[in-house]
A protein has these predicted regions:
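Bateman/CBS regulatory modules and CBS-like beta-alpha motifs in cytosolic regions of diverse proteins
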Residues: 1-29, 35, 40-43, 47-48, ...
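Short hydrophobic beta-strand motif reused across regulatory alpha/beta modules
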Residues: 49-52, 57, 137-144
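A short, polar/charged loop-to-alpha-helix boundary motif
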Residues: 57-72, 144-157
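A contiguous, mid-protein "functional segment" used to position or interact
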Residues: 122, 127-151
């Protein structure tokens, strides 16, 4: 079986967002860098959570009562509901919307194990960590590219198992 490690496919220059950043600021960072999720780090650069587009949408859709229960794109919310969602995005911080149960892997972890975790936990990206410092990120797109490339060595699927950590 082909062995590719996280370090072989991960993005090394990871765009992160600092704890305390507004949700609006994080959304702008995502748009600017064309990413759908960001590791959230503290002042020392330690991972404290993950923020995804879904987290932002869920926070925004659950904020104003006028938008609850409606289907996005099917029914237009009242203008004041959109304004309220925008105000909240400006005033609330990433830690109000981020996920703190984060699946993480090390640089040596097999890509096959990362792919399995993505399926099991219904996640689109996993941070690659050294201790609690983010050294890379692997997205589903990275895994698909690795499958398409089809290169690597033999691997033992029981090595380098990922873990879910409560941050």
């Amino acid at each position: 079986m082909v062995y590719l490690a996280a370090k072989d496919i991960m993005t090394r220059n990871v765009v992160t967002v600092r704890k305390g950043t507004s949700i609006e600021g994080a959304a702008r960072l995502m748009a600017e860098h064309d990413v759908s999720g960001l590791p959230v780090v503290d002042g020392e650069g330690h991972l404290v959570g993950m923020l995804s587009e879904s987290d932002i949408l869920l926070k925004g859709l659950h904020a104003p009562s006028e938008m609850r229960g409606s289907t996005p794109g099917l029914f237009a919310p009242q203008p004041d509901a959109v304004d309220e969602a925008h105000r909240r995005a400006q005033s609330e911080c990433v830690e109000d919307a981020m996920t703190t149960d984060v699946v993480v892997f090390s640089e040596e972890s097999p890509v096959a194990n990362i792919a399995q975790a993505m399926i099991e936990h219904a996640i689109n990206r996993v941070p690659i960590v050294d201790g609690r410092r983010v050294v890379g990120i692997v997205s589903r797109k990275d895994v698909v590219r690795a499958i398409a490339a089809g290169t690597g060595d033999e691997y033992d699927p029981d090595q380098h198992v990922g873990r879910v950590i409560k941050l």
